[in-house]
Amino acid sequence: MDVNPTLLFLKVPAQNAISTTFPYTGDPPYSHGTGTGYTMDTVNRTHQYSERGKWTTNTETGAPQLNPIDGPLPEDNEPSGYAQTDCVLEAMAFLEESHPGIFENSCLETMEVVQQTRVDKLTQGRQTYDWTLNRNQPAATALANTIEVFRSNGLTANESGRLIDFLKDVMESMDKEEMEITTHFQRKRRVRDNMTKRMVTQRTIGKKKQRLNKRSYLIRALTLNTMTKDAERGKLKRRAIATPGMQIRGFVYFVEALARSICEKLEQSGLPVGGNEKKAKLANVVRKMMTNSQDTELSFTITGDNTKWNENQNPRMFLAMITYITRNQPEWFRNVLSIAPIMFSNKMARLGKGYMFESKSMKLRTQIPAEMLATIDLKYFNDSTRKKIEKIRPLLIDGTASLSPGMMMGMFNMLSTVLGVSILNLGQKRYTKTTYWWDGLQSSDDFALIVNAPNHEGIQAGVDRFYRTCKLVGINMSKKKSYINRTGTFEFTSFFYRYGFVANFSMELPSFGVSGINESADMSIGVTVIKNNMINNDLGPATAQMALQLFIKDYRYTYRCHRGDTQIQTRRSFEIKKLWEQTRSKAGLLVSDGGPNLYNIRNLHIPEVCLKWELMDEDYQGRLCNPLNPFVSHKEIESVNNAVVMPAHGPAKSMEYDAVATTHSWIPKRNRSILNTSQRGILEDEQMYQKCCNLFEKFFPSSSYRRPVGISSMVEAMVSRARIDARIDFESGRIKKEEFAEIMKICSTIEELRRQK
């Protein structure tokens, strides 16, 4: 059907149409090839912003380092990282003065966190740089490998299971003269196949020991691996993001815990809250500025943009902030928190995979690894790449680039927000000591600034003063990209404010549709997304009804499960028609079995199986929800599952949906091609790790999950738990005497085997 698009906007206020200008339909752009070029860009830019700083050499690694702190005063308009320590400290002092006790209280909260956090906190997160294999791995595997290497090198504090003890091992590892690691490699052999008598290549996976001297180990411990950020909309160029190794992660976690605790107490901070809570917080600040700007005052708002926030931040500034925030705290606590910024001041950026070359004439392709960039003849490269490599060469060591200034994306979001808020805090009249004053909102690098003054000159003066104050702490407001409006209309973190926040519905568009997990989860996620958008994003009833119909249509096409009485022919239609004809109560069939859709906007909160249960034929119920059915996944399904949905900005977010285990909740198997590569050993480790954890969870269901205290191993904990549970079950008559005896016998056998081992 052809719709004249202008008709859609006849009754819509202009600000609500903002959503249609966002680049959020269709697939987002992904990067291909290596991120080496983007990483070199980042390293070179970061050094350029700080180029008038002082050069020094790291005595341990020999890496050249640039320190712009307390260097020349920053210049107007040019982004720079020349923060002044005394200015940062003063901003911190004023922040504390206007929020008495804020640092003290946050330190106490964080001390508790430090003492209670378990090392498994580090298993959260996806890809992590694994220094033992010098490449990325899932976080849990990278942690397991690190701990394994630590143990084989005599570092065992981590066995207590506390994160702080693992960090003690990290500190000790840096003092060791050498570290021995195990690496995976693969051998290829040509052998004759007995069956076919042909020559085939046989691959075997080996593990070999390798010694790293102190310098090599330090370089690896301080390395951030880099990748290209994928799926970034509305940008022409890709950019690099970093993933740190396990040595850095734990320290960063504690610093961010402290900063998060501070942010929670600051009304101008857009972190760590999100969604509606964030909107309410922001609306409060705006309301305050508007009510306080009496009829005599003007109020203007800047929708702010900072130039290269991360690349102008400096870990040395963060160290100064932490030193100030923790100044009255115990020595051990101050030390733990100061390590992350110190490590970041000495960080190395891994350049990624290197460059791919192809020769059209000779039909050759070859990879130039990053390690070779320091020595290779530059005549093979085009001009722009040649310039990049020339610039970065003095910084290269073993395929990594020394990167002392700058912060890499997303590492200290909370702490950098504290810095931003401290400048917003200086806008109070008691600090500006003049007729203009300001307030605003800060969320990582995004900000909105509200300036009040009696006249336009005052507004201009206020903006100028804010701009210059920011410069002194290494924040560069972009004059080109920021714009100013009468207060009441602005944008902050993709929320659009026009006398209240307007729903920016296009942000949610990518999460509509079929997720592709399995038939059961997809149906549940699809209707939950529609329900959530009715609650949070002004999705009206008529549009929601239409979204629902489109979703069902999309779902049927994805899983080829058109209604049993349809004319559409697909690979499944023969089976589905047969089921349709055999079924007495056709309304009871799930949509994925060719049944009708019973959802409307009033019952989106009910899982489909529950919605149709009373309508189902008995034998259909039996097949659908029979735990002995081989097609039912035997994973115990929690009543609530988490799906990852892709909103348009920010990281993928986790969304809860109701899960009912049926024959449709299958879990696809892993791709087999990985099993023939050097990854195989790693994969087996990972599966074993997974199995142990799953088994452990069986013994300690989350409701009663108190970790075994003391030094007991996982096995001991499970055995003692099994005995307790068995006794309770036996005494309450849930199990027979024979079963009880058998359980006790198994427990004793396990203990006996452990003793023999």
UniProtKB/Swiss-Prot annotation:
UniProt-listed GO biological process terms: DNA-templated transcription; symbiont-mediated suppression of host gene expression; symbiont-mediated suppression of host mRNA transcription via inhibition of RNA polymerase II activity; viral RNA genome replication; viral transcription
Enzyme Commission numbers on file: 2.7.7.48
The UniProt record lists the keyword Nucleotide-binding: yes
Tree of life domain: Viruses
Limits of the RdRp catalytic domain: 286-483
Keyword Phosphoprotein: yes
Disordered: annotated span: 52-82
Matches recorded under InterPro entries: RNA-dir_pol_NSvirus, RNA_pol_PB1_influenza
Modification note: Phosphorylated by host PRKCA.
Subcellular location: Host nucleus; Host cytoplasm
Enzymatic reactions: RNA(n) + a ribonucleoside 5'-triphosphate = RNA(n+1) + diphosphate
Subunit-structure text: Influenza RNA polymerase is composed of three subunits: PB1, PB2 and PA. Interacts (via N-terminus) with PA (via C-terminus). Interacts (via C-terminus) with PB2 (via N-terminus); this interaction is essential for transcription initiation.
Family per similarity comment: Belongs to the influenza viruses polymerase PB1 family.
Protein name as it appears in the record: RNA-directed RNA polymerase catalytic subunit
Natural source organism: Influenza A virus (strain A/Chicken/Pennsylvania/1/1983 H5N2)
